[in-house]
Amino acid sequence: MALSSALIKIFITFLFLQNHVNSQYSSPSKPQPSLGSTISFSITKFDDESPNIFVKGDASISNGVLSLTKTDKYSGKPLQKSVGRATHLTPIHIWDETSGELADFSTSFSFIVNTNGSRLHGDGFTFFLGPLHFDLPKNSSGGYLGLFNPETALIPSQNPIVAIEFDSFTNGWDPASPSQYPHIGIDVGSIDSRATVNWPLDFVQTNALGEASINYNSESKRLSVFVAYPGSGKNATGVSFVVDLRSVLPEWVRVGFSAATGELVETHDIINWSFEAAL
């Protein structure tokens, strides 16, 4: 009996130690904040040494401004075929796989798109939510806005992306516009917007400051965007679309901006940015 009791004690001790080792050295494959968590940030002035903003392609930070596309260093004029992206490195838990819960989020930013007074200009910029490891696509200049590649741009199953596009040139997949009227669109896995509204970019003064507000309500699943040009005399414009983000996005995403020029050019500058998400 004494020998049997000793063996049982040894076995129990072995199981305890094994469990302790497993719990000590196992690490989660993704961030694990609890439900009810909130992530927020506010950038009133961009810093080129900020560890939280990752720029790629032609995007750069200078004098407190995030420039998404490239300009000539001598003349300051925008360059053709420029593509840039800036991403906030904080992972956003946009929905929870276990509970099925969706996050609410809101973001606002000020921007300047300078067309240099040209009637024809392009191509635009986006605010987007995409996978944690989302590289800058090849051949994504022009109407692909630094977000899509030509081969899969119209195939939603290939693009786990949701974006608000500020599109200044009408391409073949855009709403018909004989006058090349710029538009704001909601993109769900495709460059072909699910909902659009006219963007009064050509009817405000050069270098006018625009203000955008984007919100997602997890109960109604409505994604909404409003854009205004304070002091311009133009009414705010807005568009919304109902989308279940769980059907498009991975559980964890990053948020950011992208932009592109093609044969036509303009500048795309983000002046400030705030974001908040709550799950």
UniProtKB/Swiss-Prot annotation:
CDD domains: lectin_legume_LecRK_Arcelin_ConA. InterPro entries: ConA-like_dom_sf (IPR013320), L-lectin (IPR016363), Lectin_LegA_CS (IPR000985), Legume_lectin_dom (IPR001220), Leguminous_Lectin (IPR050258). GO terms for molecular function: carbohydrate binding. GO terms for biological process: response to symbiotic fungus. Induction: Accumulates in roots during colonization by arbuscular mycorrhizal (AM) fungi (e.g. Glomus intraradices). Glycans are attached at N116, N139, N235, N272. Keywords: Glycoprotein, Lectin, Signal. The keyword Signal applies. Residues 1-23 form the signal peptide. Pfam families: Lectin_legB. PANTHER family: CONCANAVALIN A-LIKE LECTIN FAMILY PROTEIN, LECTIN 6. Belongs to the leguminous lectin family. May be involved in arbuscular mycorrhizal (AM) symbiosis with AM fungi. This is Lectin 9. The lineage of its organism: Eukaryota, Viridiplantae, Streptophyta, Embryophyta, Tracheophyta.
